[in-house]
Amino acid sequence: MSKATGFIKEFRDFAVKGNAIDLAVGVIIGAAFGKIVDSLVKDVVMPLVNFILGGSVDFSNKFLVLSMPDGYTGPMMYADLTKAGANVLAWGNFITIIINFVLLAFVIFWMVKAIYSARRKEEAAPEAPAAPPEDVTVLREIRDLLKDKQGS
């Protein structure tokens, strides 16, 4: 067998029989789960937070201008300033990302907690004890008969 054929066989064994398939499935499911969590935060949690706080939790347009380009007369918006070359400390965007992270972590925590709780309930369901093997049953009957004989 040539080295190329051996390499191809080795790669096929790795890709098909190894953990590569499990890893690929995990990555695909993880990506899909990420979209679910992202939608849950953006489409459900954030609107509720915005409603409760009475406005938008978006500080991305809060910033501190450290230096302006000479002769700049455009709007004082973050996107316009950075496009013009202004040195801007975007603290508001940082705060918004932190808030989003905390909310996302909170949602994931509750989802995982619910999944583990459901698993524990499944595991906690007691199984009916298995019937003893026939030889054990026969030995118990013999024991009981011997006890009865000794007692009489």
From Swiss-Prot:
Origin superkingdom: Bacteria
Question: Which InterPro entries does the UniProt record give?
Answer: MS_channel (IPR001185), MSC/AndL (IPR037673), MscL_channel (IPR036019)
* One CC-aspect GO term: plasma membrane
Entry keyword annotation includes Cell membrane: yes
Q: Does the keyword Protein biosynthesis apply?
A: no
Localization of this protein: Cell inner membrane
Main localisation: membrane
Q: Where are the transmembrane segments?
A: 21-41, 44-64, 92-112
Briefly state the protein's biological role. Channel that opens in response to stretch forces in the membrane lipid bilayer. May participate in the regulation of osmotic pressure changes within the cell.
This protein is called Large-conductance mechanosensitive channel
- Per the UniProt entry, what species is this protein from, by scientific name? Bordetella parapertussis (strain 12822 / ATCC BAA-587 / NCTC 13253)
